[in-house]
Amino acid sequence: MAIRLNHSVIPVSVKLGAPTRVSARSSLPFSVGDWRGVSTFSGARPLVLAKVKLRAESTEEDRVPIDDDDDSTDQLVDEEIVHFEERDFAGTACVPVYVMLPLGVIDMNSEVVEPEELLDQLRTLKSVNVDGVMVDCWWGIVESHTPQVYNWSGYKKLFQMIRELGLKIQVVMSFHECGGNVGDDVHIQIPEWVREIGQSNPDIYFTDSAGRRNTECLTWGIDKQRVLRGRTALEVYFDYMRSFRVEFDEFFEEKIIPEIEVGLGPCGELRYPSYPAQFGWKYPGIGEFQCYDKYLMNSLKEAAEVRGHSFWGRGPDNTETYNSTPHGTGFFRDGGDYDSYYGRFFLNWYSRVLIDHGDRVLAMANLAFEGTCIAAKLSGIHWWYKTASHAAELTAGFYNSSNRDGYGPIAAMFKKHDAALNFTCVELRTLDQHEDFPEALADPEGLVWQVLNAAWDASIPVASENALPCYDREGYNKILENAKPLTDPDGRHLSCFTYLRLNPTLMESQNFKEFERFLKRMHGEAVPDLGLAPGTQETNPE
């Protein structure tokens, strides 16, 4: 008997007892010779490979029982199995890789935090040919106390450090609060003077049906309302971006800053803050609509009157709570009100507000950064993707139910402004999600496929980043598959990838070796250990 793995035929001696069905979840407990066990790494799911000492012959004592739910069998493995299927990316297109710097790399006093340690880490990144880093420029730090008084001093010091090492800088215009979401390890609020306005006019914030105000970012209802000390939200965003462009002119002229990512909502993403942890949301809750501030409600009422049904100028009343399931609601269940005449009207309006906000802010960004590439981030709402309503996407503002394409119109808006689309969750596997949360009916792979193709069909650049920390080969291989699709007839690929994020765990020896290997493959370089498990090497039988 022989096993063919990664184009290599490996002889295996197997001694079987009674026929058996081996469960996919069954472990393979090898105890013969020099057992090394089933290889796992950094919390990833085990690869199906094992390493067993070579033997000239087997004895009855070497027989190893393999337990199964329904039956058992005896099996012998007489050869090392160290290969697994892994695609060779040598010679493929180079996809630049950037690394996000820590969220709190600049403190509230506009000083670089632990600059010597940071410099050492940046040198290490440069040594493995990372293309650059991503830096959040926080509105709450730079324009903290007084309108139109900007303090860029800490960022200037940081950018000079990065420039001296020959790294590029992706800059994020971060108009949102940091803190309270998954992965946030610092708390940076929006500017103090804006929060003072919010105390007397809380409708400047997104609001849910219970009247809870979300202070992560400003509601899109005030984009054109002069409620911020005589300025509209759009004017505030433009003035901030223009100040940055003037202050860092030399970095633009030297092409140190090749791209600006513009924050369009919570976490810098173009979405409603529909699943806030601060209000008790837990995965995989469907979230709630966030349109109950007076400005968005006035917009909804006006849209209903134009439609000729003024009684539609209200939010749905049967969507339940943040942690509900679609089938537990009258609105999102199969055949629910989401697909009624009113439901379609409401969802059209709700998603149009999102697209119009992106349209307006990206237009301002192109004015501020004329001649520089701009980008914006779209979140990967992959839970409940396998249901008809796609409830979690609907509450986030993506009208992507099973009978609609919710991402084509967004891609068309990006195309209008020649903006790149940055998408998350490219490292996630649908099978993993099904094993961990089968009730969520998630499909991150299907979502990534839909969004990437919507963007490519609109002829806009597509960048990406991982949604959760990733240190293992399996996650990196999934990113590579999405970055350079094997079956794409046009050879399309990501314009760049941004790794989340620089931290002590990444810098650990084995994790950094895996990252360096991933980086080479993203750059289209050959790696010597293709098809081998991490930490193993080819061995020759004696």
From Swiss-Prot:
Question: What catalytic activity is recorded?
Answer: Hydrolysis of (1->4)-alpha-D-glucosidic linkages in polysaccharides so as to remove successive maltose units from the non-reducing ends of the chains
Keyword line: Carbohydrate metabolism, Chloroplast, Glycosidase, Hydrolase, Plastid, Polysaccharide degradation, Transit peptide
Q: Record keywords: Ion transport included?
A: no
Alphabetical GO biological process terms: polysaccharide catabolic process
Say if the entry is tagged with keyword Plastid.
Answer: yes
Query: Which residues are the active-site ones?
Result: E269 (proton donor), E465 (proton acceptor)
InterPro entries, from UniProt?
A: Glyco_hydro_14, Glyco_hydro_14_CS, Glyco_hydro_14B_pln, Glycoside_hydrolase_SF
Phenotype caused by lack of the gene: Normal growth rate and starch breakdown in leaves during the night.
CC annotations in GO:
chloroplast; chloroplast stroma
In its UniProt record, a GO molecular function of this protein is: beta-amylase activity
Activity regulation: Redox regulation; active in reducing conditions, inactive in oxidizing conditions.
Positions with a binding annotation for substrate? D136, H176, D184, K377, H382, T424, N466, A467, R501
Protein EC: 3.2.1.2
Q: Give the induction note.
A: Slightly by cold stress.
Q: The organism sits in which domain of life?
A: Eukaryota
Q: What function does the entry list?
A: Low beta-amylase activity. Interacts poorly with starch or other alpha-1,4-glucan.
Q: Which family does the UniProt entry place this protein in?
A: Belongs to the glycosyl hydrolase 14 family.
The protein's name in its UniProt record: Beta-amylase 2, chloroplastic
From which organism does this entry originate?
Answer: Arabidopsis thaliana (Mouse-ear cress)
The beginning of the lineage is:
Eukaryota, Viridiplantae, Streptophyta, Embryophyta, Tracheophyta
